[in-house]
Amino acid sequence: MPRSLKKGPFIDLHLLKKVETAVEKSDRKPIKTWSRRSMILPNMVGLTIAVHNGRQHVPVHVSEEMVGHKLGEFAATRTYRGHAADKKAKR
């Protein structure tokens, strides 16, 4: 169920402050964050945000299409290694 429109988008205040200072200074260094739950806002477009996936920070370059999505959607937490190979097919 999506968030109510009257509440507005959620973003952690510490991340919002970092984004605003990066936009003011036109700083292109990646912004490190653990806040996967924060929504991507239009003023984040063009920035690189390093989102934590549980093990490391994954750099996410924000584009126009990402606005409205959450940061965690772009940093996968699980690695897919493929299904087990069919042993009969190898023979």
Curated annotation (Swiss-Prot):
Keyword match Transcription: no
A molecular function (GO) term: rRNA binding
InterPro entries: Ribosomal_uS19, Ribosomal_uS19_bac-type, Ribosomal_uS19_CS, Ribosomal_uS19_SF
Biological processes annotated in GO: ribosomal small subunit assembly; translation
GO cellular component: cytoplasm; small ribosomal subunit
Keywords, ordered alphabetically: Ribonucleoprotein, Ribosomal protein, RNA-binding, rRNA-binding
Keyword Cell inner membrane set for record: no
A Pfam family: Ribosomal_S19
The protein's role, per its UniProt record: Protein S19 forms a complex with S13 that binds strongly to the 16S ribosomal RNA.
Family: Belongs to the universal ribosomal protein uS19 family.
The name this protein goes by in its record: Small ribosomal subunit protein uS19
Naturally occurring in which organism (per UniProt): Chromohalobacter salexigens (strain ATCC BAA-138 / DSM 3043 / CIP 106854 / NCIMB 13768 / 1H11)
